[in-house]
C-alpha cells in the first residue's frame, strides 16, 4: 500500500548519509539472512539496523512503524500515523551508543501508568525501563540512572522515604510528577521535595490569564522561564498542563543547592484548596500565586565525597497530565521538547538524543487558543465589516456633497 511506499522513501533517504548504507534483501529469496542479527521472524518491510563495527543490531518491524487506532465508525483498526523515521533513527542511536540508560519507576502508590506515547519517547531515547516496588526495596538498584515517581496518589512510608532519600543524597537523578487532585496527605513524598528547597501548595492552580481556554482556567499555558530545559520550545509551540499543582521555592536554601524555575503561572493565579468545590472562582482559603509548575534542582553536596558529576539532580513537574499522549505525540505542543530535554539532562547525555514524533497520514486541524479564536472572530465578523461599512458610508456622503 501507500504506507509501504512511504517507508521505502524514508529508508532511501538514509542511504549515503555518513557511513550509512542501505541493502535490500527479499526474505523469500534470502530466508536465513536475518538469523545472523535476530531470532525474530522477519516479514516484508521489516528493517534490521546493523553496526558492523561493534556487531550491535536492532530489528525495526513494519508494525513498529505503522501506528493504528480504532475507527469507531467502522469498528476496525486504521493506520493513522507513520513512525518510520523515528523508529529507524532510534535504532541507529541504539546500536551506536556506548551505554543504555536505565529508568526505574516506583509502584505501589497508585502511580500513573506510563502513557504509550511516554513509553515511545523513552524507547526512542534509548532508555530502558524497570519497575521498583519501593515497599519491599532496601535500596534503589545500582543500575538506576533515573528514578521516576509518576504521580502517586498515596504517600510513601517512612521506610520508603529513607530508601529514596538515601539514593538522592548519594547523587541520584530523579524525575517527579505530582498528582494534582489527590485528597491524601503526601507527607513523605513532599518531604523528598522540601529536602531540596521546594514546597508544594495545596490544591490545584486556577489561572485565567495563563490558560489554554477561557472556559477551562485550570488548563495552563505556563510562561517559559530562562532555563536550558525549556529554551528549545519555539514561539509557535505551547506547553499545556491540564490541572496542575503549584510549587514555591524556599527563601533560604543551603549553599550547595540550586533550584531553577522552568515554567511559571501569571501573577493572577491562585491555588484552589478545596478540590471538591463546584466553582473555579476564588474562595476563602485559596492561596495566591504566582507559582512554579516545573523546576530543576541540583545539589552538589554529593560531589564533595564522590567527585565531579555525582551531583543530585531532580526535575519536577506539577502535574502527571503533562506527559499525556495528546501533548506528546506531535510537535504542535512544547511538552515533548521539555520532556526530552529533561530526560537528556538527567541521563547526562552530552548530545541530544533525537526522539522524532510520528508523522500523521491524515489531515490535521490547526489548534487555536480560545483567546485567539475570539479575537479573530471579532475581527472578521465585527471589526472588518464595520470598517468596510464606514468606508462605504464615507464615500457615499462625500459623493452626495459633490
Predicted regions: what they are:
Residues 1-402:
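Short, surface-exposed patches at the edges or C-terminal ends of soluble domains, predominantly
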Amino acid at each position: 500500500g501507500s504506507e509501504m511506499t512511504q517507508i521505502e522513501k524514508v529508508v532511501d533517504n538514509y542511504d549515503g548519509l555518513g557511513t550509512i548504507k542501505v541493502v535490500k534483501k527479499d526474505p523469500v529469496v534470502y530466508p536465513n539472512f536475518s538469523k545472523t542479527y535476530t531470532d525474530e521472524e522477519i516479514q516484508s518491510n521489516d528493517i534490521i539496523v546493523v553496526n558492523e563495527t561493534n556487531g550491535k543490531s536492532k530489528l525495526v518491524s513494519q508494525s513498529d512503524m505503522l501506528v493504528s487506532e480504532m475507527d469507531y465508525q467502522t469498528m476496525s483498526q486504521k493506520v493513522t500515523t507513520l513512525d518510520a523515521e523515528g523508529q529507524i533513527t532510534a535504532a541507529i542511536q541504539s546500536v551506536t551508543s556506548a551505554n543504555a540508560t536505565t529508568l526505574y519507576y516506583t509502584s505501589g502508590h497508585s502511580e500513573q501508568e506510563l502513557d504509550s506515547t511516554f513509553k515511545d519517547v523513552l524507547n526512542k531515547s534509548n532508555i530502558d525501563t524497570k519497575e521498583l516496588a519501593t515497599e519491599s526495596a532496601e535500596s534503589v538498584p545500582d543500575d538506576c540512572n533515573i528514578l521516576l515517581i509518576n504521580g502517586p496518589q498515596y504517600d510513601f512510608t517512612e521506610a520508603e522515604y529513607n530508601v529514596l532519600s538515601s539514593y538522592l543524597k548519594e547523587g541520584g537523578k530523579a524525575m517527579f510528577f505530582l498528582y494534582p487532585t489527590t485528597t491524601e496527605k503526601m507527607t513523605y513524598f513532599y518531604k523528598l521535595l522540601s529536602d531540596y528547597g521546594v514546597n508544594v501548595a495545596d490544591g490545584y492552580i486556577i489561572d485565567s490569564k495563563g490558560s489554554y481556554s477561557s472556559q477551562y482556567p485550570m488548563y495552563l499555558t505556563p510562561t517559559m522561564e530562562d532555563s536550558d530545559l525549556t529554551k528549545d520550545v519555539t514561539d509557535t509551540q505551547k506547553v499545556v498542563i491540564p490541572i496542575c499543582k503549584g510549587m514555591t521555592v524556599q527563601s533560604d536554601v543551603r549553599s550547595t543547592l540550586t533550584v531553577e524555575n522552568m515554567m511559571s503561572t501569571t501573577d493572577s493565579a491562585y491555588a484552589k484548596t478545596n478540590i471538591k468545590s463546584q466553582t473555579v472562582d476564588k474562595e476563602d482559603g485559596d492561596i495566591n500565586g504566582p507559582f512554579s509548575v516545573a523546576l530543576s534542582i541540583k545539589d552538589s553536596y554529593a560531589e564533595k565525597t564522590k567527585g565531579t558529576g555525582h551531583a543530585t539532580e531532580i526535575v519536577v513537574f506539577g502535574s502527571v497530565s503533562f506527559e499525556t499522549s495528546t501533548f506528546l505525540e506531535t510537535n504542535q505542543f512544547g511538552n515533548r521538547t521539555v520532556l526530552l530535554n529533561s530526560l537528556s539532562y538527567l541521563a547526562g547525555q552530552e548530545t541530544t538524543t533525537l526522539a522524532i514524533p510520528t508523522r500523521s497520514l491524515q489531515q490535521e486541524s490547526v489548534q487555536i487558543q480560545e483567546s485567539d479564536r475570539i479575537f479573530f472572530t471579532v475581527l472578521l465578523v465585527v471589526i472588518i465589516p464595520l470598517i468596510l461599512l464606514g468606508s462605504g458610508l464615507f464615500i457615499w456622503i462625500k459623493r452626495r456633497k459633490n
